[in-house]
Amino acid sequence: ADIIEAYRMATEAMRRREPCSIAYHGNIVDLLEYAEREKILIELLSDQTSCHAVYEGGYCPAGLTFEERTRLLHESPEQFRHLVDISLRRHFEVIKKLVARGTYFFDYGNSFMKAIYDAGVKEISYNGVDEKDGFIWPSYVEDIMGPQLFDYGYGPFRWVCLSGKHERSEEH
């Protein structure tokens, strides 16, 4: 779906109070900037890009196709890094505006807020200077799972077995 169609489908599903899954092929920054411009309320928002490897291709800068991103990543890593930083700053600014209008945003634990900080946005840190006190938005674990399950660094869930083979889960 394109941006307009994606939001139309989401709005219609919400009106009907029905679950809906929409595949949007594009950049999240463009999608969120459209929502902000059009005053579309996003109630719950997170980010699941691979920001633990933001400059190694885990984040595709707004304005580039995936193919352009891949070419630039290999041919001009410094230019790629520059475009990632610009896009991360735009990403932060639009999320900040959406949060001010009522969106609940949380970091999914993918180093998104750290990547924004590394892109030069000190405002994302609690103290506005460095990352030692954490960031302004909560992470999924600390804010959603943490209050009941993981406050003390441990909880009822220890291992995830992605193979689906029970014997693998017993190795740990």
What are these model-derived regions, one by one?
Residues 1-158, 165-167:
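Glycine-rich phosphate/ribose-binding loops and adjacent secondary-structure elements
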Residues 171-172:
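Conserved small/polar residues in nucleotide/adenosyl-binding loops
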